């Protein structure tokens, strides 16, 4: 049975009517037309669907809509724009960290959540945090450099 659920998406209040067990990813993509989070594995194992929920990177393909009720959700679209990318997005651009793009949403959203929590992470902390995001092209070195660059950019006055 459908129910109406209220949540915050990219700083805006949203009400969605759907089955409570509908994956949050489907609501974001199909109902709210937010295509930053991607459908990858559908099992929460690849990271392509990562969003930030209340400051924590989370896999939206395995979170039921009911589990997002009243929560603050940020998608890739909520970080920046083409004209003014978020510092993490800009760092990924500057370091040319993308090839096929499969992992970019998950890597960027996970990096943003990490840097919000730990402004100056070690390489080991960055690797540990990003290790659950599947990158098919192997741009791991560029991704690591991008996260380091984003951390440095945030430190500058």
UniProtKB/Swiss-Prot annotation:
Binds 2 [2Fe-2S] clusters per subunit. Pathway: Cofactor degradation; nicotinate degradation. It comes from the Bacteria. Its cofactor is [2Fe-2S] cluster. SUPFAM superfamilies: 2Fe-2S ferredoxin-like, CO dehydrogenase ISP C-domain like. Induction: Repressed by NicS in the absence of 6-hydroxynicotinate (6HNA) or nicotinate inducers. In presence of 6HNA, repression is alleviated. GO terms for molecular function: 2 iron, 2 sulfur cluster binding; metal ion binding; oxidoreductase activity, acting on CH or CH2 groups. InterPro entries: 2Fe-2S-bd, 2Fe-2S-bd_dom_sf, 2Fe-2S_ferredoxin-like_sf, 2Fe-2S_ferredoxin-type, 2Fe2S_fd_BS, Beta-grasp_dom_sf, Diverse_Oxidoreductases. [2Fe-2S] cluster binds at residues 41, 46, 49, 61. It holds the Pfam family Fer2_2. Keywords: 2Fe-2S, Aromatic hydrocarbons catabolism, Iron, Iron-sulfur, Metal-binding, Oxidoreductase. It catalyses: 2 Fe(III)-[cytochrome] + nicotinate + H2O = 2 Fe(II)-[cytochrome] + 6-hydroxynicotinate + 2 H(+). Disruption phenotype: Cells lacking both nicA and nicB lack the ability to hydroxylate nicotinate. Cells do not grow in a nicotinate medium but grow in a 6-hydroxynicotinate medium. Its EC number is 1.17.2.1. GO terms for biological process: nicotinate catabolic process. Residues 3-79 form the 2Fe-2S ferredoxin-type domain. PROSITE patterns: 2FE2S_FER_1, 2FE2S_FER_2. Subunit of the two-component enzyme NicAB that mediates nicotinate hydroxylation, the first step in the aerobic nicotinate degradation pathway. Mediates conversion of nicotinate into 6-hydroxynicotinate (6HNA). This is Nicotinate dehydrogenase subunit A. It comes from Pseudomonas putida (strain ATCC 47054 / DSM 6125 / CFBP 8728 / NCIMB 11950 / KT2440).
